[in-house]
Amino acid sequence: MGPKYVFITAIIGVFWHVQGFPNPGIKQDKAVHNRELSEERPLEEQIAEADTVSRGTSKENQEMLKNDSFADELGLLMSVAEKEGDVKRSGSVRSSVGGHRGTLDDADSTKNLKPAEYFDSTKSMLDYKYEDDPDGLHQLDGTPLTAEDIVRKIATRIYEENDRGVFDKIVSKLLNLGLITESQAYTLEDEVAEVLQQLIANEAKNREKEAGDLDYAAVRSDVYDDDKQEGKMETRNKNEDRESSETKNEDSFSSKERRNELSPEEDFDDLQYFPNFNRLIKSLNSENDAKEKKTLITIMKTLIDFVKMMVKYGTITPEEGVNYLENLDAMIAVQAKNKLGKSFGSHKSILSEDKNVDESDSTKQEAAKMEKEYEALKDSTKPEPKDAEDKDKPKGKAETYLEAIRKNIEWLKEHNKEGNKGVSDNDLSKLKDFINQQADSYVEKGILDKEEANVIKRIYSSL
């Protein structure tokens, strides 16, 4: 009987402390109380209540995650194992639970309300695309992420930020939390490195493909333009052939005209030191004399270069070279006067004013001597030009000047530093080689025509 009484006493003690339904502490009007139970509250009150609840629940999470930029990756890796393990188990239950939840949510209108952050325009709408997946464990189509997807996501993050420190921070936190071991960390590093290398290779291929597409488009555009113009070009072939022949003739004429338009000062810098030669060039001012003037300038320059070469090799002294060039200019005046019938001034105007009287006399004597030698060696069978037209022919001027060059070479032989022994065959060979090189260079530069160069070569080869 003792235990029976004890059991009855315990039951009475339990029911003694049981309370009934609570009564309102404050007396309310019966109509207000019934309205709260039967009618839905105003929308403003529901929004305010939902806002208060949302702020209270998310405040602690925001405090914990605001200083950690990699919280999404950590949360993703920490919960991926549990998520993947429960996917199959929760697949069948989700439909029934979802349907039941939908019924409850429909009954409670506060469940459909969005948090205050949802209406904030500064936040991305992607953050609320999957509200039941805060860790980003689902893809865009809603399917859960696999381990390969997680590795690819980490590799993509490293590739976009171009920083390997992202992986180091994630692995160090996983190791500190004890979620992975060191061997798993090495395996994860190898997998991420492989995916990262594949991303880089794909990016390189895409760039090459884009560059190839641009080149192909440019080539196709050129081909299209060529095909478009081909029909027009065929109709104008005959006209272009005729125009091309005319253009060639005009180009040939313009090139010669352009060379003739060059002033003597541009072609011959040392012209100022030869006043008689300068007068001779200025006298050839007609169109027929343009080619002759160019030839004379070229020959004079070649002769000066030859004198410089002789001085360089020591064949003559610098004083003898200067004397030779002065007598050359004086002889030009004398022979031009005799052959062409033109006076280029007295010998006093030819020589420089800085020369003394003795130097002027010696120059005059030398010029007179050379004139006598020329008269003695002159071909007596050749008739003298009598008509003014014959005197003004370019051919006569060229022959006169070339004969003067021969006489100057003979004078150079006699005034060699070795006395009257003359110039050796070696010197003449050097002279011929030098003249040939100069003539070829003038042809390449466009100063002389090929025919003019051949004439000069032929003259010096006959010395």
Curated annotation (Swiss-Prot):
It comes from the Eukaryota. Residues 1-20 form the signal peptide. GO terms for cellular component: extracellular region; transport vesicle membrane. Pfam families: SGIII. InterPro entries: SCG3. The keyword rRNA-binding does not apply. Residues 102-111, 229-262 have a biased composition (Basic and acidic residues). It is a peripheral membrane protein. Keywords: Cleavage on pair of basic residues, Cytoplasmic vesicle, Membrane, Secreted, Signal. Disulfide bonds: none annotated. It is found in: Cytoplasmic vesicle, Secretory vesicle; Cytoplasmic vesicle, Secretory vesicle membrane; Secreted. Interacts with CHGA. Interacts with secretogranin II/SCG2. Interacts (via C-terminus) with CPE. This is Secretogranin-3. It comes from Xenopus tropicalis (Western clawed frog).
